[in-house]
UniProtKB/Swiss-Prot annotation:
Family, per entry: Belongs to the mimivirus BTB/WD family.
Positions of the BTB domain: 3-73
Natural source organism: Acanthamoeba polyphaga mimivirus
Taxon lineage: Viruses, Varidnaviria, Bamfordvirae, Nucleocytoviricota, Megaviricetes
Alphabetical list of InterPro entries matching this protein: Quinoprotein_ADH-like_sf, WD40/YVTN_repeat-like_dom_sf
Protein name stated in the entry: Putative BTB/POZ domain-containing protein R773
Amino acid sequence: MQSNIELVITDEKVQTRIIADKNILSENFPYFKAMFMYTEGQADYVCLHTQNVQVAHDLIVSCGNTSYKFQDKTWDYIFDLYKCRNFFGLDFIPLVDNTVPPEYIDKLIDTMEIIGYDYSTIKYIAHNLPKDYALNKLSIELLKSIQQILSEFYFLVENRNGLSMFDGVSKMCLKLFEFDFYSVEQMSYCYLNQTNRLVILDTNNILKIFDVQTLNVVAISSGNCFCNSIIYLESKNCIVGINSGGFEIYDAINLKLIGKINGPKQFDYVETSLIGKSSDDKYIIFQQAVETDYGYHYQLMIALVETGEIIGPIYNDKKEFSCICSPTQNIIIYGNYNNFTLWSLDSRSVIAELRLNVDPFKFVFIGFSLDGCYIIFVDSNAIAYIWSIVTKQFIRSNSTISMRNHKNPTYACNSYRQFNKEKFGLNNISILPNNNLVSTKGNCISIWNIMCQEPIESFNLPIDSFMSKIQVITNKRDLANKIRNFINS
């Protein structure tokens, strides 16, 4: 077989020619490997008709090398490149880090359909699909596949060795970031769930964005970020950091400082910590610990991201309290021991008060289900209580929760699930996308159906369990819930 061959590449408008080595083509492209096994193996030239001559030329010249930089190419070029790679028998691999703009989503879906739907192409659609996309344009089969991918989750493990991410299904580990043991408490980070990136505020007060697949640093803040914690607002694509003076807002792509919100100044000595955000990213919820002559006084505060208005304190206590934010509604629940209040951020009023008449009066976990329909309480005896947002009742209980204007609140004394305490870890409890509950004991992870006493799955992660913090990372919750509701409607 002759070594060289002339490739005559044409599309509807232009033509180009490439002199290439058959052996190199066969090694890098399954299409040419199969071609040269037949009569074309003895040919001097071959004619190829493609959709885009320039794209085919670049792909052949680069020998299909995915390290070639495509960041400066147009989206039309990128989509033609995906089709061309598929034509030459190459696997689908996302070639750019940027999120596909909304105006190109239909073309993205058409391109993936031409390539063929499999896990990699559907995952690419799922990670780029806007939450306001018209779902009736997609088939139910495709929506179910997207929903399944959006239900995937990861374990983000923080310990004295650094940060590691584990796939929730395969349990495969990806080492992300290493830092000194003594700086653990100074680290703050948040996960950008639509781009598969991690933002870290390091001990030098510098923000960095890491691609969790390549481990590359894709952006660094130009100045210092003097914040003690950060959070990601997906709908605004920005990072919000908090400190005693207020808030700093950074662009989530290039980490440029784009705004500030001044905090309340009525106290001289105050520690401010971030709690969370509302489901629509309009509100930031934070706690202030005010130092007095008699110790600390704890306050629950709200900030409006758009206007910078500070609301509160909406709750005061001499003891530390818990507060969590609903993933789907603009409501929060706060309190301590066995007294909790459900509060609306939009109406700025109490929705309901919960009294859990249980012993001991100590809860190690309070969380919303990811569909926002239930609140789950777990106490130090591994007993779980589930309260419905819709019915304002504990599951399997006839006792409704009283509203604030009711004189005699009712209690949840017979509505509980008792987990196997020998297997149930009281640290790092989280809710999974399927509303199962995950707990850790040492480096053993157990996944529980909330109605069952025994775990449905247990496995060990290869981690140093000393001082480990494990966080469950999920994909686009809003879009996953929207697809679920659309399919069920």
